[in-house]
A protein has these predicted regions:
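Feature marking well-ordered beta-strand scaffolds used for ligand recognition
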Residues: 1-277, 293
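Soluble extracellular-acting proteins and domains
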Residues: 240-344
Length: 344
């Protein structure tokens, strides 16, 4: 270049450049601490609890959002078994928090019999006084094939009173419904699995998510369209529990703006609690039978006669709670019965 101020006066040099010999090349020394991921894949907010959970690729965040304009970071958690922290779900009482690991970005088969149970799974934490404590994992239990992309993905709560139940999509692993009321021992209680799209080769597809909404489960299947399911009773989920869940209605639902689930004072809710006491031996069989009969009799009454019968039953339940192995559930049942007593 003959004149730097005039780009038109440029000459091309055709001679080659000489490379100088350089020895002992060293990487520059770091100029500060190494940073981690600087953004979150998903953030689930739970306004009624004043909390938010960020799934932030390499770790999970817990935030206090009681003042939404000034959120406070409470804790960050990591797990060497996790590849990609993807999404989060709170239990309804905010005593538990579940994070998903989308190992391989949802495009790999990670549910084979040879895959560890804690890879591409859900990590479950207890949450107390703003602190998380890891207690368990959940992974859909049915082994999948080499031609099925499968990993934990999106889902949400099913509003069964007294229990923490979630429905979740696992890509070609299907839709899984599981109970994490005991966070150290989660258990699958229902599932739907179409099988591989192509048994001879991996074709990406499966359930991106499973969500419960007003009595139905909606599964968005990437390759095969939308599936709609209804729950059916089993030993792990009674018709009374399903009926109680169906009483919770939404006008709209944003799964990442988690709503507080509230049940009306209704006989199906009371019977759901009784079924749980029977299943878990929370009261002697003689008492659960008597409570069932008392509820049936009260439901046939009306006005002051019904209120009097329910008041008597509530008092009996208060006494039952003092010696019950599941006192909290008995007290919850008593609260529902008192709500029925005062209902018009």
């Amino acid at each position: 270049m003959t004149d730097r101020s005039d780009p038109a006066e440029v000459k091309i040099l055709t001679d080659s450049l000489d490379a100088l010999g350089v020895k002992n090349i060293r990487m520059p020394a770091p100029r500060g601490p190494r940073g981690g991921p600087s953004q979150c894949h998903d953030i689930t907010v739970y306004p009624s609890a004043g909390l938010a959970a960020g799934a932030c690729s390499g770790y999970g965040l817990l935030l206090n959002i009681k003042d939404p304009l000034h959120p406070v970071r409470l804790q960050a958690v990591a797990d060497s078994n996790f590849s990609f922290w993807h999404s989060a779900t709170f239990s309804n009482d905010a005593s538990k928090l579940l994070y998903t690991d989308e190992w391989g970005g949802g495009t790999q088969p990670k549910c084979r019999a040879t895959d560890p149970i804690d890879w591409g799974a859900d990590a479950i934490f207890t949450l107390r006084n703003g602190k998380l404590n890891h207690v368990g994992y959940f992974k859909m239990p049915a082994a999948q094939t080499e031609t099925e992309n499968c990993v934990a993905h999106n889902g949400g709560l099913i509003p069964v009173p007294g229990r923490d139940i979630m429905v979740q999509g696992w890509y070609q692993g299907g839709v899984s419904v599981f109970d994490f009321t005991n966070p150290a021992h989660p258990k699958e209680i229902a599932y739907f699995d179409r099988g591989p799209i192509d048994a001879s080769k991996l074709v990406i597809g499966g359930y991106w998510a499973g969500y419960y909404y007003n009595g139905y489960i909606y599964g968005s299947e990437i390759a095969r369209g939308l599936d709609v399911f209804k729950l059916t009773p089993t030993a792990d989920l009674t018709q009374n529990e399903i009926d109680a869940a169906n009483l919770v209605r939404f006008n709209s639902l944003n799964p990442q703006m988690q709503p507080k689930l509230v049940w009306p004072a209704a006989f199906p809710v009371a019977r759901a609690y009784v079924d749980q006491l029977v299943r878990d031996n929370g009261l002697p069989a003689s008492r659960t039978t008597a409570i069932t009969n008392a509820l049936r009799s009260a439901e046939k009454l009306s006005g002051t006669a019904r209120a009097a019968a329910l008041k008597t039953l509530a008092g009996q339940l208060d006494r039952d709670a003092s010696g019950a192995s599941d006192a909290a559930r008995v007290r919850a049942l008593a609260t529902v019965v008192r709500g029925l007593e005062s209902a018009k």
